[in-house]
């Protein structure tokens, strides 16, 4: 077993119980989270799961790292995988890219309709309960919705339903693909 020297409030003990998450936070060199805002949130009592004090004590070693793309690899000015190249100064190729995306996903091809896109984990934590609440109203507007991700069956079912219910306006793909 573990020695008594670890059973202290500055190591493993947390409110009378062993807490291995606390131990991980205590013994890690740095602490990373999925975003800068989440790094701040977990330092509050509401999101800190009783570890907020420890996280605040180590706030200079807590970092949020944004998910993102490699701008060199996904640069529309040089990306050979897209139908047409474009830049901030010359957007002429962007319309062709949009039209091909709409066609490939079974959306109505329309250069004037805005596309709302989401790539990520389909989870209540991402606020998708709010999308569930307003999806009917949202899709009554002149918009299209593209969802790419994997996650909770509740949201897979929601977006599968929406794709059938709002033909030509919603496309959902349940895999991580670029």
Task: Label each region the model flagged.
Residues 1-178:
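Catalytic cores of nucleotide-sugar-dependent glycosyltransferases that transfer UDP/GDP/TDP-activated
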